[in-house]
Amino acid sequence: MAEILCTICARGGSKGVKNKNIRKINKLEMIAYSIIQAQNSKLFKHIVISTDSDEIASVAQKYGAEVFFKREAHLANDRTAKLPVMRDALLRSEEHFKTCFETLIDLDASAPLRSSLDIKKAYESFVENDNSNLITAVPARRNPYFNLVEIQNNKVVKSKEGNFTTRQSAPKCYDMNASIYIFKRDYLLENDSVFGKNTGLFVMDESTAFDIDSELDFKIVEFLISLKNLSPKDF
């Protein structure tokens, strides 16, 4: 198998939920879920953390992830796009490990509801379809062809034109959940968008839709994890 790099990007300055990446959900720090899922997938020799926080780095190392650089300030503010952060982690990892990774898989630290099986199936889809990159999503609960609107000149207009009278008749749409990103090395180095001519989509269970950006998100995810009642070996 070609060597795959796993990255988990977790900055310390979260505004919506303070210290969310190391806040505990059912006795485990949130970032621990992604680290353990990566380990359980058996896809990776290296699980690398990109962070600007010494506290996050310490917690991540406790669970077996590797932290050998500190993310620079210009890549750690709330306006920084994620692709440059992943690209930085890839190049630093290649220099550190003296190897060239063919593929990078990034796991969002604030999306703990995925499983190791999700990671494996997403990678299998990526390989089978020979995608340049892959994003994950869930079936959308709202549809721009049917029940999403915009305001233009103080009037309501449909987000997408179309004569669809039921949700079932409208084109299927998907809500990106930011849980898993997969890139071929060359694509990541040469592009600044996740939308390319050969981008794949892996559809996940709707329960994985929650990316923790608010206290409400945190409470919902905490409840869903408690319902599953999983131990780390089941992640």
UniProtKB/Swiss-Prot annotation:
Pfam families listed in its UniProt record: CTP_transf_3 (PF02348)
Keyword Transferase: yes
EC number: 2.7.7.82
Source species, domain of life: Bacteria
Protein name: CMP-N,N'-diacetyllegionaminic acid synthase
Keywords assigned by UniProt, alphabetized: Bacterial flagellum biogenesis, Nucleotidyltransferase, Transferase
Catalytically driven reaction(s): N,N-diacetyllegionaminate + CTP = CMP-N,N-diacetyllegionaminate + diphosphate
UniProt function note: Involved in biosynthesis of legionaminic acid (5,7-diamino-3,5,7,9-tetradeoxy-D-glycero-D-galacto-non-2-ulosonic acid)(Leg), a sialic acid-like derivative that is incorporated into flagellin via O-linkage to Ser/Thr. Catalyzes the conversion of N,N'-diacetyllegionaminic acid (Leg5Ac7Ac) and CTP into CMP-N,N'-diacetyllegionaminic acid (CMP-Leg5Ac7Ac).
GO biological process annotation, one example: bacterial-type flagellum organization
Gene name linked to the record: legF
UniProt GO molecular function: N-acylneuraminate cytidylyltransferase activity; nucleotidyltransferase activity
SUPFAM superfamilies: Nucleotide-diphospho-sugar transferases
Family statement: Belongs to the CMP-NeuNAc synthase family.
